[in-house]
Amino acid sequence: MKMRRFIGAAAAMAVAGTLTVGAAAETYNAYIGFQTAPYSFRNSFDDASYGKDVADGKYFNSVIVWGGNDPETFPQYEDKFDDDMPDGSGGYVIPATYTDVQIDKDGTYKVGITDFDWALDSSSSFNLLFVSTDIPFNKDAGEDGESIAKFSDCKIIVDGTVTSEVADPIIDTEDGKKSGHTKVLFANIWNDALKKDGYNGAYPTKSLEIEFTVSGLDAQQPADTTAPTTGDSTKPNTNT
Protein backbone atom coordinates (compact mmCIF):
# COMPACT_ATOMS: atom_id res chain seq x y z
CA MET A 1 0.00 0.00 0.00
CA LYS A 2 1.31 3.46 -0.90
CA MET A 3 2.05 5.66 2.12
CA ARG A 4 1.16 9.36 1.93
CA ARG A 5 2.61 12.15 4.03
CA PHE A 6 0.51 15.16 4.96
CA ILE A 7 1.56 18.77 5.48
CA GLY A 8 -1.24 19.84 7.83
CA ALA A 9 -4.98 20.25 7.46
CA ALA A 10 -5.04 23.89 6.32
CA ALA A 11 -2.35 23.48 3.68
CA ALA A 12 -3.85 20.19 2.58
CA MET A 13 -7.16 21.83 1.73
CA ALA A 14 -5.33 24.41 -0.38
CA VAL A 15 -3.50 21.91 -2.57
CA ALA A 16 -6.04 19.11 -2.70
CA GLY A 17 -6.17 17.33 -6.06
CA THR A 18 -6.38 13.94 -7.67
CA LEU A 19 -3.77 11.34 -8.56
CA THR A 20 -4.25 8.84 -11.38
CA VAL A 21 -3.05 5.45 -10.19
CA GLY A 22 -2.23 2.84 -12.82
CA ALA A 23 -2.79 -0.76 -11.86
CA ALA A 24 0.44 -2.75 -11.78
CA ALA A 25 0.86 -5.12 -14.73
CA GLU A 26 0.72 -8.82 -13.95
CA THR A 27 4.06 -10.54 -14.53
CA TYR A 28 4.20 -14.11 -15.82
CA ASN A 29 7.06 -16.52 -16.47
CA ALA A 30 7.96 -18.82 -19.36
CA TYR A 31 10.40 -21.73 -19.53
CA ILE A 32 11.67 -24.04 -22.25
CA GLY A 33 10.90 -27.72 -21.72
CA PHE A 34 11.82 -30.89 -23.61
CA GLN A 35 12.27 -34.63 -23.54
CA THR A 36 14.73 -36.38 -25.85
CA ALA A 37 14.07 -39.78 -27.41
CA PRO A 38 15.99 -41.59 -24.60
CA TYR A 39 13.99 -39.52 -22.05
CA SER A 40 16.52 -36.90 -20.96
CA PHE A 41 14.37 -33.98 -19.93
CA ARG A 42 13.37 -30.71 -18.37
CA ASN A 43 9.76 -30.96 -17.25
CA SER A 44 7.17 -28.20 -16.87
CA PHE A 45 7.85 -25.63 -14.18
CA ASP A 46 4.86 -26.87 -12.15
CA ASP A 47 5.72 -30.58 -12.32
CA ALA A 48 5.20 -32.21 -8.94
CA SER A 49 8.41 -34.28 -9.08
CA TYR A 50 10.88 -32.24 -11.14
CA GLY A 51 9.41 -28.71 -11.20
CA LYS A 52 11.04 -25.47 -10.10
CA ASP A 53 9.76 -25.66 -6.52
CA VAL A 54 11.18 -29.15 -5.90
CA ALA A 55 14.52 -29.31 -4.03
CA ASP A 56 15.08 -25.57 -4.54
CA GLY A 57 15.07 -26.03 -8.31
CA LYS A 58 17.90 -28.58 -8.31
CA TYR A 59 16.28 -30.76 -10.97
CA PHE A 60 14.44 -28.04 -12.87
CA ASN A 61 17.59 -26.00 -13.44
CA SER A 62 19.47 -29.01 -14.77
CA VAL A 63 18.89 -31.70 -17.39
CA ILE A 64 17.89 -35.11 -16.06
CA VAL A 65 19.67 -37.87 -17.97
CA TRP A 66 18.97 -41.53 -17.29
CA GLY A 67 21.78 -44.04 -17.32
CA GLY A 68 20.32 -47.40 -16.38
CA ASN A 69 20.61 -46.54 -12.68
CA ASP A 70 24.36 -46.93 -13.13
CA PRO A 71 26.73 -44.11 -12.05
CA GLU A 72 29.40 -45.49 -14.41
CA THR A 73 27.31 -45.16 -17.58
CA PHE A 74 28.67 -41.65 -18.12
CA PRO A 75 31.90 -41.68 -16.08
CA GLN A 76 32.67 -38.04 -16.85
CA TYR A 77 29.51 -37.13 -14.92
CA GLU A 78 29.81 -39.66 -12.12
CA ASP A 79 29.79 -36.86 -9.54
CA LYS A 80 26.41 -35.72 -10.93
CA PHE A 81 24.72 -39.07 -10.36
CA ASP A 82 21.76 -39.00 -7.98
CA ASP A 83 20.62 -42.40 -6.73
CA ASP A 84 17.62 -40.95 -4.92
CA MET A 85 15.62 -39.10 -7.54
CA PRO A 86 12.10 -37.86 -6.69
CA ASP A 87 10.51 -40.89 -8.36
CA GLY A 88 12.82 -43.30 -6.54
CA SER A 89 15.13 -44.10 -9.46
CA GLY A 90 18.70 -43.08 -10.14
CA GLY A 91 19.93 -40.72 -12.83
CA TYR A 92 22.23 -37.85 -13.68
CA VAL A 93 21.53 -34.23 -12.79
CA ILE A 94 23.56 -32.50 -15.50
CA PRO A 95 24.24 -28.74 -15.27
CA ALA A 96 22.92 -26.50 -18.04
CA THR A 97 22.30 -22.80 -18.59
CA TYR A 98 18.66 -21.85 -19.12
CA THR A 99 17.23 -18.61 -20.38
CA ASP A 100 13.81 -18.19 -18.77
CA VAL A 101 11.80 -15.04 -19.35
CA GLN A 102 9.34 -12.79 -17.54
CA ILE A 103 6.29 -11.63 -19.50
CA ASP A 104 4.48 -8.49 -18.40
CA LYS A 105 2.99 -7.21 -21.65
CA ASP A 106 2.28 -8.16 -25.24
CA GLY A 107 5.46 -8.69 -27.23
CA THR A 108 8.05 -11.15 -28.54
CA TYR A 109 10.04 -13.28 -26.10
CA LYS A 110 12.64 -16.03 -26.19
CA VAL A 111 13.52 -18.96 -23.92
CA GLY A 112 16.38 -21.40 -24.35
CA ILE A 113 19.13 -23.69 -23.12
CA THR A 114 22.89 -23.72 -23.65
CA ASP A 115 25.94 -25.39 -22.06
CA PHE A 116 24.56 -28.92 -22.28
CA ASP A 117 26.17 -31.94 -23.95
CA TRP A 118 23.41 -32.82 -26.43
CA ALA A 119 25.34 -35.85 -27.69
CA LEU A 120 25.47 -37.41 -24.23
CA ASP A 121 22.41 -39.66 -24.55
CA SER A 122 22.95 -40.29 -28.31
CA SER A 123 19.58 -38.76 -29.17
CA SER A 124 18.74 -37.05 -32.45
CA SER A 125 15.11 -36.08 -31.86
CA PHE A 126 12.59 -34.92 -29.27
CA ASN A 127 9.64 -36.74 -27.77
CA LEU A 128 8.51 -33.43 -26.30
CA LEU A 129 9.36 -29.81 -26.99
CA PHE A 130 7.36 -27.04 -25.38
CA VAL A 131 7.17 -23.74 -23.54
CA SER A 132 5.59 -23.95 -20.10
CA THR A 133 4.20 -20.77 -18.54
CA ASP A 134 2.24 -19.63 -15.53
CA ILE A 135 -0.07 -17.60 -17.76
CA PRO A 136 -3.58 -18.64 -16.67
CA PHE A 137 -5.57 -21.13 -18.71
CA ASN A 138 -9.32 -20.64 -18.41
CA LYS A 139 -10.67 -24.18 -18.27
CA ASP A 140 -14.27 -22.93 -18.32
CA ALA A 141 -13.94 -21.12 -21.66
CA GLY A 142 -15.72 -23.12 -24.35
CA GLU A 143 -15.55 -26.87 -24.73
CA ASP A 144 -11.79 -27.25 -24.31
CA GLY A 145 -10.89 -24.11 -22.37
CA GLU A 146 -8.42 -21.50 -23.59
CA SER A 147 -5.44 -19.45 -22.50
CA ILE A 148 -6.00 -15.83 -21.56
CA ALA A 149 -3.19 -15.03 -24.03
CA LYS A 150 -2.61 -15.83 -27.68
CA PHE A 151 0.71 -17.27 -28.89
CA SER A 152 1.84 -16.79 -32.48
CA ASP A 153 4.79 -16.37 -34.85
CA CYS A 154 6.95 -18.94 -33.08
CA LYS A 155 10.46 -19.91 -34.14
CA ILE A 156 12.61 -22.83 -33.11
CA ILE A 157 16.26 -21.84 -33.23
CA VAL A 158 18.96 -24.52 -33.17
CA ASP A 159 22.61 -23.53 -32.79
CA GLY A 160 21.69 -19.98 -33.76
CA THR A 161 19.74 -20.89 -36.92
CA VAL A 162 15.96 -20.82 -37.33
CA THR A 163 14.99 -24.40 -38.16
CA SER A 164 11.20 -24.16 -37.90
CA GLU A 165 8.51 -21.50 -37.87
CA VAL A 166 5.04 -22.06 -36.42
CA ALA A 167 2.50 -19.30 -36.99
CA ASP A 168 -0.26 -20.78 -34.83
CA PRO A 169 1.10 -23.23 -32.24
CA ILE A 170 -0.91 -25.84 -30.37
CA ILE A 171 -1.90 -25.06 -26.79
CA ASP A 172 -1.99 -28.10 -24.50
CA THR A 173 -5.63 -27.89 -23.43
CA GLU A 174 -5.52 -31.18 -21.55
CA ASP A 175 -2.69 -29.97 -19.35
CA GLY A 176 -4.29 -26.53 -19.06
CA LYS A 177 -7.53 -27.92 -17.68
CA LYS A 178 -5.57 -29.83 -15.04
CA SER A 179 -2.93 -27.28 -14.09
CA GLY A 180 -4.65 -23.98 -14.85
CA HIS A 181 -1.51 -22.88 -16.74
CA THR A 182 -0.70 -22.37 -20.42
CA LYS A 183 1.70 -24.76 -22.17
CA VAL A 184 2.64 -24.31 -25.84
CA LEU A 185 3.50 -27.52 -27.71
CA PHE A 186 5.94 -27.97 -30.58
CA ALA A 187 6.62 -31.70 -30.33
CA ASN A 188 4.70 -34.46 -28.58
CA ILE A 189 4.88 -37.99 -29.95
CA TRP A 190 1.77 -38.90 -27.97
CA ASN A 191 -0.35 -36.15 -29.54
CA ASP A 192 -2.10 -37.17 -32.77
CA ALA A 193 -1.73 -33.77 -34.46
CA LEU A 194 1.91 -33.37 -33.47
CA LYS A 195 2.84 -36.89 -34.54
CA LYS A 196 2.40 -35.56 -38.06
CA ASP A 197 3.19 -31.87 -37.77
CA GLY A 198 5.43 -31.66 -34.71
CA TYR A 199 9.03 -30.48 -34.80
CA ASN A 200 11.33 -32.84 -36.70
CA GLY A 201 14.06 -30.44 -37.72
CA ALA A 202 17.73 -30.21 -36.82
CA TYR A 203 18.87 -31.45 -33.43
CA PRO A 204 21.03 -29.13 -31.31
CA THR A 205 24.71 -29.52 -30.66
CA LYS A 206 25.21 -26.23 -28.81
CA SER A 207 21.97 -24.36 -28.15
CA LEU A 208 18.20 -24.59 -28.41
CA GLU A 209 15.85 -21.59 -28.30
CA ILE A 210 12.16 -20.95 -28.83
CA GLU A 211 10.95 -17.49 -29.78
CA PHE A 212 7.27 -16.60 -29.55
CA THR A 213 4.92 -13.64 -29.65
CA VAL A 214 2.32 -13.09 -26.95
CA SER A 215 -0.79 -10.97 -27.41
CA GLY A 216 -3.97 -10.39 -25.45
CA LEU A 217 -2.31 -9.71 -22.12
CA ASP A 218 -2.64 -5.94 -22.39
CA ALA A 219 -6.41 -6.35 -22.62
CA GLN A 220 -6.35 -8.29 -19.34
CA GLN A 221 -4.81 -5.43 -17.35
CA PRO A 222 -7.20 -3.46 -15.11
CA ALA A 223 -8.01 0.09 -16.19
CA ASP A 224 -6.36 3.02 -14.45
CA THR A 225 -8.22 4.31 -11.42
CA THR A 226 -8.43 7.82 -10.03
CA ALA A 227 -7.78 8.21 -6.32
CA PRO A 228 -7.87 11.39 -4.21
CA THR A 229 -4.62 12.77 -2.88
CA THR A 230 -3.76 15.76 -0.73
CA GLY A 231 -0.57 17.80 -0.88
CA ASP A 232 2.78 16.68 -2.22
CA SER A 233 3.49 13.17 -1.04
CA THR A 234 7.22 13.61 -1.71
CA LYS A 235 7.63 16.26 1.00
CA PRO A 236 8.52 15.36 4.59
CA ASN A 237 5.84 15.27 7.24
CA THR A 238 5.63 18.71 8.92
CA ASN A 239 2.90 17.86 11.39
CA THR A 240 3.68 18.86 14.96
Regions found by a protein language model. Name each.
Residues K235-T240:
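Long, low-complexity, intrinsically disordered segments
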Residues A25-D224, P228-G231:
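Beta-rich carbohydrate-recognition modules and glycan-binding surfaces
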